[in-house]
Amino acid sequence: MRIDIITVLPELLRSPFEASIMKRAIDKGLVEVHFHNLRDYTTNKQKSVDDYQFGGGAGMVMMIQPIDDCITHLKSEREYDEIIYMSPDGETLNQKMANKMSMYENIIILCGHYKGVDQRVRDHFITKEISIGDYVLSGGELGALVLSDALIRLIPGVLSDETSALTDSFQDNLLSGPIYTRPADYKGWKVPEVLTSGHAAKIEKWREDAAYEHTKNRRPDLLEEH
């Protein structure tokens, strides 16, 4: 997978890709991540990427020209499965969406900033708008990181134990149930006996039941889709 991230703050994005799972994926050659500074595509001497709103109003708007030039340049080099705009009014990211998108070869993620982007960008360039929740951030960069992490960890070969991703919360519209590690008895707080029984079928049944109960208590809405 190749991820091209368009941003005005590339320095905000670099370090998360230099650690943990995302770094491992890049080192293995399973993922390429490229950052594109919008200021490199401006045509004005000030390297500004924003301007005042037509009709007045609070907040600056990201201009269409540098975004157009950047996206057009990238599209001239390869085809993209999706051109994504991180937006609070986009479709809320979920595991089903991540599963599908993790199979893409090339995506562009545009990070909004200021008040947002010129509507013509959304009308003519963007193929999908994604939100990470019902709240507003200072820019789309953190959302782009969340999306990237959600996709990258699902790519075959990234996780040392690929079955780990298959048992994550939301994979079957269920939350993960309780998990434990050693010691089996700590201050009298004991791990459920079934988990130390060595009986694979009973352990699997316990985990399924525990996941269902946990979901019923925390996110009953998910069971409507289960």
Swiss-Prot record:
One Pfam entry name:
tRNA_m1G_MT
Q: What is its main location?
A: cytoplasm
Q: Which InterPro entries match?
A: Alpha/beta_knot_MTases, tRNA_m1G_MeTrfase_C_sf, tRNA_m1G_MeTrfase_TrmD, tRNA_m1G_MTases_N, tRNA_MeTrfase_TRMD/TRM10
As one GO molecular function, the record gives: tRNA (guanine(37)-N1)-methyltransferase activity
By its UniProt entry, which Gene3D superfamilies does this protein fall under? Answer: 3.40.1280.10, tRNA(m1g37)methyltransferase, domain 2
* GO BP terms in the entry: tRNA N1-guanine methylation
Is tRNA processing tagged as a keyword? Answer: yes
Q: What is its EC number?
A: 2.1.1.228
Q: Where in the cell is it found?
A: Cytoplasm
- What EC class does the entry list? transferase
Record-listed S-adenosyl-L-methionine binding positions: G112, I132, G133, D134, Y135, V136, L137
Q: Which UniProt keywords apply?
A: Cytoplasm, Methyltransferase, S-adenosyl-L-methionine, Transferase, tRNA processing
Reaction equations catalysed: guanosine(37) in tRNA + S-adenosyl-L-methionine = N(1)-methylguanosine(37) in tRNA + S-adenosyl-L-homocysteine + H(+)
Q: Indicate whether Transferase appears among the record's keywords.
A: yes
One GO CC term on file: cytosol
What is annotated about its quaternary structure and interactions? Homodimer.
Q: Which family does the record claim for this protein?
A: Belongs to the RNA methyltransferase TrmD family.
User: Briefly, what is this protein's role?
Assistant: Specifically methylates guanosine-37 in various tRNAs.
* Identification of the protein by name: tRNA (guanine-N(1)-)-methyltransferase
Q: Which organism is it from?
A: Flavobacterium johnsoniae (strain ATCC 17061 / DSM 2064 / JCM 8514 / BCRC 14874 / CCUG 350202 / NBRC 14942 / NCIMB 11054 / UW101) (Cytophaga johnsonae)
Its organism's taxonomic lineage begins at:
Bacteria, Pseudomonadati, Bacteroidota, Flavobacteriia, Flavobacteriales
Q: Which gene encodes it?
A: trmD
